[in-house]
Amino acid sequence: MNAIPTRKIAALLGLLACSTLVGINPAHASSHMDAPLITLDPAANTTDVYAFVAVNPAGQKVLEVALGVYPFEEPGVGPNKYNFDDNVLYQIIVATGADVAAGNDSITYQFQFTTGYKTQGTILQSYVGVVNADGDSSQNLTQTYTVTKVVGGTSTLLGTGIVPPNNQGVATPHYNVGENGNNPAKPGVTDPTQLDVYTLGAIENLSNGYRSWAGQREDGFYGDVNAIFDLLNLRTGSTNSFDSQSGYNVHMISLEIPVAELGGDQQVVGVYATTSRQQMAVLSSGAGSPAPALTGGWVQVARQGNPLFNEVLVAIKDKDLYGRTKPSSDAALFQQYASTPELASLVNTITFSGMNVAPTTNRTDLVGIFIPDMLRVDLSTGPARLAAGGSNFPAYPDDAGFSNQSVFGGDTLHSAIQAGFGGGAVAGGWPNGRRFGDDVISIAITAVISDLRTNPLTIRSAANIDNVSGNDAVYNKVFPYAGTPFNGRNYLHNPGLGLEPILNFAARGLAGNNAAPLIGGFIVQGDKPVQVLVRATGPSLANYGVTNPIAGTTLSIYSGMTQIATNSGWQSTQKAAIQATGLAPLSPNEAAILITVSPGAYTALVGGSNGASGNALVETFVVTPTP
């Protein structure tokens, strides 16, 4: 089918002929296991690279870039947590001007980390108490970092930063709904002042208008990589969606670069990232367990540009070589894999039952996309449209006009330097850079099964081909954009696989006039509404031996900052319906609300009726999950 009008497709063909322009650069997001050797080195293992145009709080146009490392972080694992490696050199590289087509480095931004402990005379490695601010006395293990700009042989220190704690749970309550370590992680926000204190406190203002952030984030990539590499046997059905990265965290390095620092916005730039280690590490035995002695120059061990290229196009024998080389060598070493992609043959054999749908030879269109392997970003456009909750969390809407299919979903931006698809229209997301939320798997497969050499182009849509329509968390619409890391005490992997959209949830504490409201939070996952019962128990707690129970409760439910329901006596409004659930409160002085809610994050606030104070319990139950 033609996903773009023929007139625009004909114009698009011209873009593909010039590697310095923004063409159809579809790519499959990395499953984070791109090459054999780097899978053995998770702290240096690059996961994804993001790059897009934005405007900073001062109103200046900036290029947002981000590098993910350390794949498949299980939330809450300890006592030795996931951290950046002091012995890894993390680099984000930007190519400008003629360097884009040549694959050369123009500007390199280096991040180097240092780890320290407030005390090593304890088994409590990361936290010795509840952390209320980055680097406080309870954050035992604390990492700091430097940011250095390198141009040619000249290095300039831009500044330093601190890494916030990982989201453990009770030890890091402010990451989570209601500032409660037992609750799920907070959803993304649209205003910087709404960021949790750890994330906000770790945003570093560097020299010359740069900003940086480094720390743990939820893995913003989504897709069924398991099925793709299970001989392309893709899952189908509304209850059979499997997100390979669901419930996992990564470590993210984010840098906000003023466009003026790159030579202005009338250009297309290239972006990629690398990790490196020193040549020699010598291990020692004996007392004191000294750290390895490191010597020699830095050796690149991984790189990331268009994630699809190494993982899906490059043969096993060359995958490690790719990680050790620069984009400037791609034409000589790896062009064959774009020109004659094995993936196209596999798709024809397995997915299309032997029909020659995807072109398999002379793929000059793919060569133009991936050689050299860098993200390309048109800096002349306005800010990219941003994702928030996508289809899984409609209560947190994406920007108007955002499509996770990018240009294939009609999401375009206006370029001042390219004709694009006509009138200066260029892709709104991947392949014009890459935003959080872009469905790069679908875009990638669309490109592979299409023919971008014909005029007009032959476009065959692969939207939602892996049966995963969006992320399992809400992105931030403000720096550093990636979502809040999952809570080690409250998270799920793939809740859509026959599991309830939320788990029954409870929290107990003081409430009423002499205390702050008792706050409970819950997140509805999936893509369909569910009916829940939220109840605020007070006087009946005495039946279970709870001392000082509150005499009466009030209950309010919020979606974001908006109150969507309130009650101060469950028998006053929904008595019959609540009784029918079998979950009615035992006392008429207790509040309860039966409500149908869409996927998203919600907060329940419990107060005291008629001036009462005391212990209360707030609970959320799934009543009728939609099949």
What would you call each of these model-derived segments?
Residues 19, 41, 82-84, 245, ...:
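Generic marker of residues within folded, mature protein domains
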Residues 27-496:
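Surface-exposed extracytoplasmic segments
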Residues 18-27:
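C-terminal segment of classical bacterial N-terminal signal peptides
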Residues 497-627:
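A sequence-level detector for low-complexity, Ser/Thr- and acidic-rich stretches
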Residues 2-13:
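Bacterial N-terminal signal peptides that target proteins for export
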Residues 12-14, 495-499:
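Phosphate/pyrophosphate-recognition segments in soluble nucleotide-handling domains
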